[in-house]
A protein has these predicted regions:
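Start-transfer (signal-anchor) and selected internal transmembrane alpha helices
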Residues: 2-60, 145, 154-156, 334-338
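Short helix- or helix-capping micro-motifs
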Residues: 54, 157-163, 204, 208
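Specific aromatic-rich, kink-prone transmembrane helix
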Residues: 138-142, 180-197, 369-371
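Perimembrane helix-loop-helix junctions
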Residues: 217-248, 259-260
Length: 371
């Protein structure tokens, strides 16, 4: 049955898009303020107040909406199990857990916070994803300022991020953790663009240990590494240090869960099991598959493959057009972005273009808004 809130959600979505279109001209405007003066501008008051309102609104919704009960119940059970038996016996004790170790720690923390905070159990499990929403919004502000946007322009972008209905609903209403993974991937992209490879590698490792879907961006990361090495071969040293830090991160996170597992193969089996446990075109509702009645349709059938193939082809055509325009204008960053996009599309298709995860649109939205 349709949710009774769908008319309001539709109206809010349309209003948000209309507002974004209205503000687009202002966001594209180049003012006459010198670059040095722009850098000295502080975050405007309206942006700070807006961010506080976004946080307060999330808390109200989080405590009022129960969330997706299937996942909420899993989070509650897994968090309490971790508190009861510890990481060494966690996976052996729980009947089912398709999450890697990193986020299991957060579930355990949430289980402990439930005993002291005057919030509903679901609301407590929403706190960290909601915090990541807001941190991602602030990171968007920082990126915009580094791209020479004025403080007002960056503040508007930040609030568009903070009040995005899809992102808001996903964490505050639906109790999903996509914002955690999305923020980590934003940081990976941000530090990669800045050339800070000693930060890129461990953060990406942490992202993979939060949700295995981060592996799907490995192709894009590999392309970025290759291009960075082509531009400057000296970066291999910080990259090597970053790889070492990534391994240290993995050991710190995984080792407590491995004590009684008899080796590291259990983690590989866990990832393989998780990635193969949803062999369906989609298991959510925010896509065309659901509109055509194809929810839970097996990807073994050939018909569902037509849509991702078509979308991949359209994406390649669009990317090719962007590269052509960039070459004519001489803007090399666009060319590099286009090439990396092609590699990402082909890479994701190679890993299984039909694999759709819950609320994957949220990760895409945060990642592209942040970029």
């Amino acid at each position: 049955a349709a949710s009774p809130a769908w008319p309001w959600m539709t109206a809010v979505g349309i209003a948000y898009v209309a507002l974004g279109v209205y503000l687009l001209r202002f966001l594209q405007k180049k003012d006459a303020v010198p670059r040095d003066a722009k850098k000295r501008e502080a975050m405007p008051l309206f942006a700070i107040i807006g961010l506080i309102i976004a946080a307060a609104a999330r808390l109200i919704v989080a405590n009022s909406v129960s969330g997706y009960q299937v996942d909420v119940n899993c989070f509650l059970a897994w968090g309490n199990t971790l508190l009861s038996v510890g990481p060494a016996n966690f996976y052996q004790t729980t009947n089912f857990c398709d999450y890697p170790p990193a986020y299991v720690y957060i579930m355990g923390l949430n289980a402990a916070l439930m005993r002291v905070l005057p919030l509903s159990a679901a609301a407590v499990h929403k706190l960290i994803p909601m915090a990541c929403d807001l941190v991602a919004a602030v990171l968007t502000y920082r990126i915009a300022r580094k791209k020479n946007a004025s403080a007002n322009q960056a503040g508007i972008l930040m609030l568009l991020m903070a009040f995005n209905p899809a992102i808001f609903l996903n964490s505050a209403g639906w109790c999903q953790i996509d914002s955690v993974l999305s923020l980590l991937l934003m940081l990976v992209a941000y530090f990669a663009v800045c050339g800070n490879w000693m930060a890129v590698m461990p953060i990406y490792m942490l992202a993979v240990l939060v949700k295995p879907q981060a592996l799907m961006l490995g192709f894009l990361g590999l392309a970025a590494i290759v291009m960075a090495l082509i531009r400057d071969r000296k970066v291999w040293k910080p990259m090597l240090i970053g790889v070492g830090l990534a391994l240290v991160t993995a050991v710190i996170v995984v080792l407590p869960f491995s004590v009684n597992q008899g080796g590291i193969s259990w983690l590989i089996d866990k990832y393989a099991q998780t990635l193969s446990s949803y062999p369906y075109a989609t298991v959510n509702t925010a896509n065309f598959y659901y509109l055509f009645g194809c929810n839970w349709t097996s990807i073994v059938m050939e018909a569902p493959r037509a849509i991702p193939l078509l979308m991949m082809a359209l994406s390649l055509v669009w990317t090719g057009w962007l590269i052509y325009r960039a070459q004519k204008s001489g803007w090399q960053p666009d060319v590099l972005t286009g090439l990396m996009t092609i590699l990402l599309i082909i890479g994701c298709f190679g890993r299984g273009g039909c694999f759709a995860t819950q609320s994957g649109w949220t990760r895409t939205m945060i990642f592209h808004l942040g970029g």
